[in-house]
Amino acid sequence: MAEHKNGVATNGYEKKSSPASSSTKSEAKPLPNGDKKDGIVKSFKQLRVASKRPLPKEMGDGSYRVVENRPGLKQDIRRLRGRDLKTLLEIVKAKVKGETQQDDKTMIMERTIQLVANLSDHSKVQESLTNSFISQLWNSIDHPPMLYMGDKFRFRQPDGSNNNPYLPQLGAARTPYSRTVRPKGMSLGAQPDPEAIFESVFARDAFRKNPNNVSSILWYWATIIIHDLFWTNLQDPNQNDSSSYLDLAPLYGSTEKDRDSIRTFKDGQLKPDCFADKRLIGNPPGVPILLIMFNRFHNHVATNLADINEGGRFSKPAEHLSPEAADAAWKKRDTELFETARLVTSGLYINITLIDYVRNIINLNRVDTTWTLDPRQEMGVSVGTKDLSESGTGNVVSAEFNLCYRWHSCLSEMDDKWVQDFYTELLGENYGPMNLQTMMKALKAFEASVADEPSERTFGGFKRGPDGKFNDDELVEALATAIEQPGGAFGGRNVPRIMKPIEMLGIMRGRKWNLAGLNEFRKHFGLKAYETFEDINSDPSVADALRNLYQHPDYVELYPGIVAEEAKTPMVPGVGIAPTYTISRVVLSDAVALVRGDRYYTTDYNPRHLTNWGYKEVDYDLKVNHGCVFYKLFLRAFPQHFKGNSVYAHYPMVIPSENKKILTNIKRADRFDFSRPEPTATRINIIGYNAAKYILEDQQKYRVCWEEGLKHLMGEAGGRFMLSGDTALHAQQRKCMGKLLYNDTWRNAVKSFYATTAEKLLAEKSYRLAGKMQVDVVRDVGNVAHTHFVARMFNLPLKTSENPKGVFSEQELYMILAVIFVCIFFDIDPAKSFPLRQGAREVAQKLGGIIEMNVKLANSIGVKGLFTSKPDKNDDPLARYGENMAKGLKKAGLSTEDIVWSQILPTAGAMVPNQAQVFAQTLDWYLSPAGEKYRPELARIAALETGDETDALLLGYAMEGIRMAGTFGLYREATGPDTIHEDDGRSIPVNAGDRVFVSFVQAAQDPKIFPNPGVVDPKRPLDKYIHYGVGPHACLGRDISQVALTELFRAVFRKKGVRRVPGAQGELKKVPRPGGFFVYMTEDWGSIWPFPTSMKITWDDGCGTDLFTLLFWCRSVPWWDLLPETTQAAPFIISSFQSQQIYSPAEIAAVLALMAFESGDFQYKRNHYPGRPGQGTANMQMPNYNLLYAKSIPELAKGWQGIESVEGLSDQELGDLLDDVTVDKYNFGSGPWFLKTQCKEDVRQAFKTDVDTGFQKYIEECVGTDLQPRLEYFQRAKTAFGL
């Protein structure tokens, strides 16, 4: 039989095997050269065919005409093998399902090659599949490429050039307008007078408001878009001085000079409250205010980009550079920050345009749907769309659309009045009739009135302050008023008369451009041409006017036609702003062209260019406001005026009263605040130690301000949580919970839990990478340990290996509790508040519902609960501790609702993230250069046996770490006027309602309280630390937190040479905030979060000194193989050493060596020879010791109560005793118990001086047996533990 390799016969052929040599049948394949006899027969047939051919007369050159006989479908089918059919079926299924991502692990590409290669050569099927394969390969890469490297293409150019790399001037500023429609028909030889057109079909006699109550803000937004796209050159009207892209040119300018005029050239910032395009000052104040909001948003973005410094893109220049090199580096950094901030800011601009603006245009804001018309939708081969609308190819705006976007009929009554007053301001009273001459005079006056320097410009009567900014109160007042003003309606006879000369110019401009007429324009977009004037507008007066002006609908000009057209009636959804018929269709086409053609909003719009944080900062979430993001702009620009859920900020494009109806109809009104925006309470920062104590200890003058957040999440019961208020009820709640938290057994239960859990998590979550142990000590240890704690104590549905039916994973439950905490105690970022509160309420209700169900089950029928672990309460002191707490709350008279919503859930939420943060910040400081010198001492203390002295010392170091690195503070609200005397001598007046923020950062460095504050002193008095708060609302869980922190520190610093992993993953990614505070980045660096999220540490190879490392990571040594079913035995062994507080590697090695020897390498739990009744366990203890051992175990003690000796016990009774103590969780604990309880102190002390001496004393004096037979096992254990 042929030799096989990997299941395929060598060389692809297989010789025939005779029946005698093979027991399996195989298809015979001929050898390549075939059989000699068959070749002769075939050659003869070919000669016979050739002899029958006619003479070659057809071609003229004496040759035969070649006729190619291609193999047919039948031949291809015959050649298909079973695996080929399977491949073909998979290809067809993928096509039908529209799958675009191949699983290359299935080798589908290679199997396709096999399929095609096996078909008949040159068959049509083979050719078709080959062509399809080549097309797929070809289409995987752009031809030619449209994306290029380098700043020239990465950043927007001031004039909009290079949007299309192959046509760099396509759509650039100062290039000609395009023409959308080719004019084919003839127009009237004598066109009607523009003034007559205005007076008859344009002019507003009485204001008609928009039928959908669209506010003036939408028209302000449209004004920005219009000025972004159109700026007709005065000397050459065919030229557009703006780019054809929505690049926010009104803010940034369309020339390098304009762009530079608003830059500070420092840190990528813009000059305060400036914008480049002076034309916008000639619009109602709301328009420039929107641009100022974008200015502020840009500076917010630039600041955060620099602070986050993703990938080192915005690092400050090195100090050693020459002055010239440093100057160049600073300039490059400024440019990088400015241009990246522009990309991000423009991203928000386009998202507001495509979501908020377009949703209102087509009335999607009135329905509960997340569907949106986003032109950036991916299509084409990559996503399985057959017909491709290309993207990122560029755009050129047309002259027709220059006229289509003149929406002057939409001016509100207020803005009509403003324009009139503006002309009066420019020209004075009694300036005469409003005509072209008057308008040109006004334009000249306007041009002269606007300063060349953007930072000196003013508008709307607003004045700049010393910092260059306008007064926020005045800007917000103007904005709120505009939001409340409905705009005008589309349709004939609604253009304010003050706009007459501008409209006349528009008519004249359309004629000079020789644009197609209204009907030609409509037909181009697939709309039916108007046949009568009544089709254009059913209002008889408008139809008659048009008839008298134009004679026939085909003669109606484009601009007069689209202004005079009838407006659509609102439709839900479909028609929102109620535009005229033609406008409603063409504006959507233009929106798609503008956005889809813009490379910076499509193919180059990604986190790599905007940074992860920048991309996410402006991205929309369809779960929040159906994707609307206008609130991000409002709340970043005016964080002290708009509430996080203000309807004025979230839906400013519709007047508030109409929004109330809309949101009520879609059942969302309860999420929003409908009050007018007003300045929020003043925040007063207090930094002194004594001032902090003064505020926190006087709850009459300074009350807690967490009730609203608690009620939002927990309902009315949340208002009864101890931290919700300052009444006698809240004090009683605190007293009750404190009594239940700190019972007689709390310290041992908490200490044992954290000691075991810390080591368990370090073992389970760590991994070996490049020869070193690593673990994410924040995400997978610190955060998770506290999550396990509250889950065990409050019986929460945590999914673990022990409780696989739990509902929430470790990370999910931690995040739920963190979100709850932030929503209640740290909801200080208005721009993030709304989505945070909505998400927090959803998860809090879900978790609270499960807890409430379980509490009811436990109180009614005694069931532990659904989806929770079922530990034996006698074997789980923490669970028993938590159960007693719940019973105590019930006994105190609390209802199930109160137990859950005013106690368990808020307490869990308050405990976990705060304690996790304490651990992360403290550990981070000791791993930093500042704390490095203290690490050897921490490692020494952590290696010692636990005890009051070592615990106090370890806690002292932890508390000092918090003092050095902790960023903690608390808010209080002043109940009345007061004066706070700061530690530095300042007197700070306070008024009722002021929010006072007490910072502990500077207070922790007060030399009067902490002498030598820059030095770590682990023996400082604990009562001096105030980062847990002081006064009636001091952290109730402080003592628990300190025990937990001590055990976490012990577990981490037992690791040999513990340190950060190299690079960014070893750093706690922080973003600085004023006052010495920090916030943190999520792991993807896409969002800022109040709590640490990730930091990886490593430690040296070797067994180390902690139990889990000893027992899990030293597997290469022989003794490990002695453990039976290690995954089951190890936890019990570790738990027993932990419970007996044995941490010395020498003692652990000795006990394990003895147990392995006595149990015959853990094969036996009972005495095998001579078969002594009652003798057994892994430690092979005599019956009298097993009785003592059983009585030391709470759940076994009751069964042996009253029996003081094994004397007189029957063999059956001795067997029962042995059955009890040889259950795995007790069997492997016998050795540690024996050492701890039966050996004298001098034996254990001997291990500390000399390992071998200690083992000898242990075997001979304590166990009382021969040393020599047991030395081999001890030597193996010593080798394993590096002793």
Curated annotation (Swiss-Prot):
<feature type="region of interest" description="Epoxy alcohol synthase">
    <location>
        <begin position="684"/>
        <end position="1108"/>
    </location>
</feature>
<dbReference type="GO" id="GO:0005506">
    <property type="term" value="F:iron ion binding"/>
</dbReference>
<feature type="region of interest" description="Disordered">
    <location>
        <begin position="1"/>
        <end position="64"/>
    </location>
</feature>
<dbReference type="GO" id="GO:0016705">
    <property type="term" value="F:oxidoreductase activity, acting on paired donors, with incorporation or reduction of molecular oxygen"/>
</dbReference>
<dbReference type="GO" id="GO:0006979">
    <property type="term" value="P:response to oxidative stress"/>
</dbReference>
<dbReference type="InterPro" id="IPR050783">
    <property type="entry name" value="Oxylipin_biosynth_metab"/>
</dbReference>
<dbReference type="GO" id="GO:0020037">
    <property type="term" value="F:heme binding"/>
</dbReference>
<comment type="similarity">
    <text>In the N-terminal section; belongs to the peroxidase family.</text>
</comment>
<dbReference type="GO" id="GO:0006631">
    <property type="term" value="P:fatty acid metabolic process"/>
</dbReference>
<dbReference type="GO" id="GO:0004497">
    <property type="term" value="F:monooxygenase activity"/>
</dbReference>
<comment type="similarity">
    <text>In the C-terminal section; belongs to the cytochrome P450 family.</text>
</comment>
<keyword id="KW-0408">Iron</keyword>
<dbReference type="Pfam" id="PF00067">
    <property type="entry name" value="p450"/>
</dbReference>
<dbReference type="InterPro" id="IPR019791">
    <property type="entry name" value="Haem_peroxidase_animal"/>
</dbReference>
<keyword id="KW-0560">Oxidoreductase</keyword>
<keyword id="KW-0479">Metal-binding</keyword>
<dbReference type="InterPro" id="IPR037120">
    <property type="entry name" value="Haem_peroxidase_sf_animal"/>
</dbReference>
<dbReference type="InterPro" id="IPR001128">
    <property type="entry name" value="Cyt_P450"/>
</dbReference>
<dbReference type="InterPro" id="IPR034812">
    <property type="entry name" value="Ppo-like_N"/>
</dbReference>
<comment type="subunit">
    <text>Homotetramer.</text>
</comment>
<dbReference type="Pfam" id="PF03098">
    <property type="entry name" value="An_peroxidase"/>
</dbReference>
<feature type="binding site" description="axial binding residue">
    <location>
        <position position="1035"/>
    </location>
    <ligand>
        <name>heme</name>
    </ligand>
</feature>
<feature type="binding site" description="axial binding residue">
    <location>
        <position position="227"/>
    </location>
    <ligand>
        <name>heme b</name>
    </ligand>
</feature>
<feature type="binding site" description="axial binding residue">
    <location>
        <position position="408"/>
    </location>
    <ligand>
        <name>heme b</name>
    </ligand>
</feature>
<dbReference type="InterPro" id="IPR036396">
    <property type="entry name" value="Cyt_P450_sf"/>
</dbReference>
<dbReference type="GO" id="GO:0004601">
    <property type="term" value="F:peroxidase activity"/>
</dbReference>
<feature type="region of interest" description="Fatty acid alpha-dioxygenase">
    <location>
        <begin position="130"/>
        <end position="476"/>
    </location>
</feature>
<keyword id="KW-0349">Heme</keyword>
<dbReference type="GO" id="GO:0051213">
    <property type="term" value="F:dioxygenase activity"/>
</dbReference>
<dbReference type="InterPro" id="IPR010255">
    <property type="entry name" value="Haem_peroxidase_sf"/>
</dbReference>
<keyword id="KW-0223">Dioxygenase</keyword>
<feature type="active site">
    <location>
        <position position="405"/>
    </location>
</feature>
<comment type="function">
    <text>Bifunctional dioxygenase (DOX)-epoxy alcohol synthase (EAS) that converts linoleic acid (18:2n-6) sequentially to 10(R)-hydroperoxy-8(E),12(Z)-octadecadienoic acid (10R-HPODE) and 10R-HPODE further to 12(13)-epoxy-10-hydroxy-8(E)-octa-decenoic acid as the end product. Linoleic acid is oxidized mainly to the R stereoisomer of 10-HPODE.</text>
</comment>
<protein>
    <recommendedName>
        <fullName>Bifunctional dioxygenase (DOX)-epoxy alcohol synthase (EAS)</fullName>
        <ecNumber>1.13.11.-</ecNumber>
        <ecNumber>1.13.11.62</ecNumber>
        <ecNumber>1.-.-.-</ecNumber>
    </recommendedName>
</protein>
